[in-house]
């Protein structure tokens, strides 16, 4: 993955967008990096970049581009996107640009969503200070969190999470962006009961599927996976359970499921006007 990014960065590719969504996403990240902007890939294409053997075997489609950046780079990134031929949704960006930007490649009808500083869906996590951990994508811990924060998790999200756990080790730190930081995950689950509730429930869902409900070819790499996902799930759950909880966590735990512990993601349309 890093070699690919460096090749794109040094190729000097400019002009029309590329037909392959992942190649185009890597091109945009490289161009942004060349201007001193902190921009990283997230969403489905980040999993293509991180687990290429798996996505190739399961024929996972590539289309939308999802990027992450920090607030201070928002304006410069917007200028870059327009210069590269993308159309900005001016109305949407004026209303929501402090947290999310939207562009589209009109010729290819390919959208680009840019999250600013944080992901806010069922749960929220900040990533502005994590953008330099890995070279191309958000760190593996954040990619895993982006799946495990989904309360009504679907099979695609489950398989994405399992693929990541099959290919990257658990570690206390980030290991230069090549490991899933347990410390990053437990920092959320030990301080926020809602995060704990959703993540532990989803880890249980992952374990159930990987231990008896996987369909042929769903988690196929064309080779042995680097790690056993069931062991990774068990180790992560043990770390979560073993991390001391904050006073705020303990107070919220007394309420439990009697109060909703997550947010319903808001759907907002795009007009590009």
What are these regions (language model features)?
Residues 1-38, 51-61, 110, 116, ...:
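The feature captures the alpha-helical scaffold/lid subdomain characteristic of nucleotidyltransferase
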Residues 52-77, 81, 161:
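Catalytic metal-binding acidic patch
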Residues 42, 69, 138:
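A conserved hydrophobic position in a structured secondary element of the catalytic/binding core
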Residues 44-48:
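Short glycine-enriched loops at secondary-structure junctions
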Residues 18-26, 66-72, 95-96, 102, ...:
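Short low-complexity stretches enriched in small and charged residues
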Residues 78, 82-123:
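Conserved catalytic core of two-metal-ion nucleotidyltransferases
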Residues 1-7, 73, 77-88:
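Short N-terminal secondary-structure initiator segments
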């Amino acid at each position: 993955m890093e070699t690919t990014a460096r090749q794109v960065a040094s190729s000097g590719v400019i002009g029309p967008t590329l037909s392959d969504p992942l190649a185009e996403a890597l091109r945009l990240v490289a161009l942004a990096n060349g201007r001193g902007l902190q921009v990283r890939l997230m969403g489905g294409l980040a999993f293509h970049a991180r687990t290429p053997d798996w996505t190739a075997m399961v024929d996972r489609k590539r289309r939308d581009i999802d990027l992450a950046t920090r607030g201070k780079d928002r304006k410069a990134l917007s200028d870059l996107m327009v210069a590269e031929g993308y159309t900005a949704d001016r109305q949407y960006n004026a209303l929501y640009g402090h947290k999310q930007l939207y562009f589209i490649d009109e010729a290819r009808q390919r959208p680009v969503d840019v999250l600013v500083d944080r992901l806010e869906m069922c749960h929220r996590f900040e990533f502005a200070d994590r953008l330099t951990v890995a070279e191309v994508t958000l760190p593996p811990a954040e990619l895993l969190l982006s799946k495990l924060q989904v309360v009504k998790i679907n099979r695609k999200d489950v398989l994405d999470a399992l693929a990541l756990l099959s290919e990257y080790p658990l570690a206390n730190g980030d290991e230069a962006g090549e490991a899933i930081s347990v410390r990053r995950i437990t920092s959320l689950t030990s301080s926020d009961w809602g995060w704990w509730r959703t993540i532990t429930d989803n880890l249980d869902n992952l374990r159930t599927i990987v231990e008896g409900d996987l369909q042929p070819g769903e988690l196929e790499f064309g080779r042995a996976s680097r790690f056993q996902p069931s062991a990774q799930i068990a180790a992560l759950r043990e770390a979560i359970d073993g991390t001391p909880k904050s006073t705020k966590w303990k107070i919220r735990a007394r309420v439990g499921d009697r109060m909703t512990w997550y947010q319903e993601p808001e759907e907002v349309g795009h007009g590009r006007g």
